[in-house]
Amino acid sequence: MEYNFTTIEKKWQKFWKDNQSFKTVSKPTDKKYYVLEMFPYPSGKMHMGHVSNYTIADSIARYYKLLGYDILHPMGWDAFGMPAENAAIEHKTHPAEWTLKNIANMKDQLNLLGYSYDWDREVTTCLPDYYKWGQWFILKMYEKGLLYRKGGDVNWCDHCNTVLANEQVTPEGTCWRCDGEVTKKKLEQWYIKVTDYAEQLDADLKLLEGYWPDNVIAMQKNWIGRSVGAYINFNLDDGKAFPIFTTRPDTIYGVTYMAIAWNYDGLLDMCTTEQKSAVEEFIKKSAKIDQKTDYEKEGVFTGRYVVNPFNGEKAPLYAANFVLAEYGSGAVMAVPAHDQRDFEFAKKYNIPVKVVIQNADNSLKAENMTEAYTEDGTVVNSDILNGLSSRDAIKRAIEYATEKGFGKEKVQYKLRDWLISRQRYWGNPLPFVHCEKCGVVPVPESELPITLPMDIEFTVGDNPLKKSESFVNTTCPKCGGKARRETDTMDTFTCSSWYYARYTDAHNNQMPFDPSAANAWLGVDQYIGGIEHACMHLLYSRFWYKFMRDIGLVKGDEPFNRLLTQGMVLANSYESRELKKFYTQEQMNNKEYEKDGIKKEDIIVKMEKMSKSKANGIDPAEIIELFGADAVRIFVMFVAPPEKDKEWSDEGVKGSSRFLNRIWNLFLKYKDEEAFKNGKSFDYNNLSKEGQKLFRKYNKTIKKVTIDIKDRFHFNTAIAALMELLNDMSVIKLANNDDYAMFKEVIRGYLILLNPIAPHMTEELYQILNFGKMILEERWVEHDEQYCKDDTFELVFQVNGKIRDRVEADVNISEDDAKAQALASEKVKAFTDGKNIVKVVYVKGKLVNIVVK
């Protein structure tokens, strides 16, 4: 019987769909498991990165189902966003039409892989039944004082024609989505006050240690940026207060200048008349840089001085492009001797350097310094702090400032409030109106959802919503007068920050979800997605969960109990640097580079993340058609551990296909043998030696596969163990009825062990071989520890360190017997006869080495 994967896979996919095989129970038992992968943006085409991510999740879900858990494994669509709007402009189609068509296409593609999704719980963020509740949450945040509107400098992408949050600007100063240049622009924007939760977000990372990757925790910790220091009230030379935040009050006597952010509110009012125009020019220049990038640190003197409260000294005040207006007070004290950035700035503008922390050999002198001394040491030239260690001086300086009333200890965070305004159409509308009489007024909950208008003209440029009179013109909910609807839509991360909770009660039209349903399933037991979301989606989701907790919708403190960040899928890229052109694998095979006048040796070959731009993407649908879904699933799970990058290889997926064919052919070989069909039970003691050996190997394989999956999700080593077992199964000669019954049990267990990864073929074989239930209804096989220990082992015989024979020996063999067997071996004697035996060495459980001359 031929292994026709196309027919088999279609059969089981139809069966699972028709029988609602993966429908979630409404009320799980205590034995529940919620596995979730980050839902995709519906671009219309699935890529191998999706396949890798979703196969990991599906294998985990199927494994836990076999363990007897109630499973929640849903799927949905992160469906708002700019690509749909850009497609509307390009293809003259509405974003909704484009998006829903893409969803249908991607859903069909996902189903080709046999994933165990409960499609009854599908959510689509661009549909009103979902985004209504996003608006509801925003109103609740507004009520609690967590949502506000303010003007200020924002990150602006001209290409996308919208605002970007700080997290959406790359370290290179470009847009995270389009790689376009990011500039500064002044706008009135909506913000969520995530800083109110900074302390919790930081402290609760401890709850995730051991369950989330260390690097993700470190990235979030750094992004939140908790630092303990002091607020010190300096004064301007006219007596006005000038507070600064510092983490190094031990260096306060070393301040030789002060720096204030170039975009500090009221900066120009601080400047002297003589310096105002210079500062204005500097502000214009600074607006063009991105403080995330590596740029030249510059400043300009404001004409003003600031008085140090510790010693009364005056320090010049500079406007500087490296100071963040949003951090601390927007101004910093500069200590050039002990901060490298301050040192470089001081050297550039000829500002004095004053040593106040001395090293161990007392050798620091300001005039000899070529770089700042940033280590701890002993405080000098600092009056009340002299002689103290740096750490003790920090405490003493804070105590002194507190006693004198010009300072206090302060915990500061780098985390900024979440800017959620977007000047685009295809997003969730903000539920507010602007009334000339009443100002900004929230829309009543009874009027939700505020739906997007359909009479929209899509052009490159300004926000299309502003041009829709039917949308913009409305009445004020407060006074009934004329009002204009808010035309900013929300950052799409507001949609993805709570979707995991909606899955627990996906069709509730009275509230976002029933708390009892949410608390039965949450937190998510296993969340899977890319590390690129560490400081955006994952941080925002943690904030949103805490907010939902605080308004009584969920219990607990964290949404995701365990996180796996899967590796990328890589493939060879082929680039002509000369032409700045990438070739596909097929074009390379056809030598199309020759038509461009390029030699093969001039093509740069790199293993890189699959992408359209690098022309190295692989279409999963094509591979499934060639080799089947199970072969693709096995390849992506076998090629590397889930957290590591996976290198695509045509040979690799062919190898997975051969593996499945071997299983198919071997297992069906016994289908019609009477001893196999009649095999029911067996006695281990009646098994042949080969049979006993295979049964022990089977039990050891169960143990290894279970540990590899449950403890580490290392499906790659689990598959390797199953391949080893298959090799042993392929060569055994079954000697009696007990052997056949044992072999039948091994086949049954083998199919269950492989089922989470290759569900179609294993289920088909399970039925053909008449094992009764479907695997879907079975339970995971368990090993018997007594059969995980070998009765025998392979004893190696060496002569002068070279292997000359191997025998099977009893595990309890004595040293004398082992040596005697070695000396009696005919293969050994061929190398020892006629020679002088110097010594015989026995290494217990491994080998005998005979040394001869």
Swiss-Prot record:
Q: Which InterPro entries match?
A: aa-tRNA-synth_I_CS, aa-tRNA-synth_Ia, Leu-tRNA-ligase, Leu_tRNA-synth_edit, M/V/L/I-tRNA-synth_anticd-bd, Methionyl/Leucyl_tRNA_Synth, Rossmann-like_a/b/a_fold, tRNAsynth_Ia_anticodon-bd
Catalytic activity line of the entry? tRNA(Leu) + L-leucine + ATP = L-leucyl-tRNA(Leu) + AMP + diphosphate
Q: Where does it reside?
A: Cytoplasm
State the UniProt keywords alphabetically: Aminoacyl-tRNA synthetase, ATP-binding, Cytoplasm, Ligase, Nucleotide-binding, Protein biosynthesis
Q: Where are the transmembrane segments?
A: none
Q: Which parts of the sequence form the motif 'KMSKS' region?
A: 609-613
An annotated GO cellular component: cytosol
* A Gene Ontology molecular function term of the record: ATP binding
State the span of motif ('HIGH' region): 40-50
List residues binding ATP: K612
BP terms from Gene Ontology: leucyl-tRNA aminoacylation
Q: Which Pfam families match?
A: Anticodon_1, tRNA-synt_1, tRNA-synt_1_2, tRNA-synt_1g
Catalytic activity, EC = 6.1.1.4
Q: Which family does it belong to?
A: Belongs to the class-I aminoacyl-tRNA synthetase family.
Q: What is this protein called?
A: Leucine--tRNA ligase
